[in-house]
Amino acid sequence: MVVDTAVYTAHTAFAALWAGSVLFVGVAVHPLAMAGDIAPAAYGRIVSTLRRVTRASALFLFLSGGHMAATGYTVESLTGSSTGHLVLTMLGLWLALAATVEAGSARALRGVEQRKIREPARDARPFLRAAAVVAVALLVVAGLLGRPPAGL
């Protein structure tokens, strides 16, 4: 029970860090890059940090989520219940978030290495916007998974 609580807490903390990082970069930092109001080196460091957070979180969430799924679900409950469907939806959204952040950060960093800012930001824009939308969707699904059962 203590291990499960610790895993759940760490899983939630990493998920919050990842989703929050994606939203911060997408909403606060990326518009500055689009306007040319941030130095390419600073933008590159921020995007590199987002990429590291994404990779670490994706790995940790895969492991901790796998533990939670293995101890709390069966194949039948994952595929045959609304809660199981939410868990599978979350897995798909995590994969989409990792992919969009990786694609966006690769495009941003490619141009930043050439000391450019507006063009790489423009190239990364659709991916970072999609990542922000996916991060919000993940928070919604997490809220639905965390709701108390009906009747409580």
Model-assigned labels for residue ranges:
Residues 1-152:
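Polytopic transmembrane helical bundles with strong interfacial aromatic enrichment
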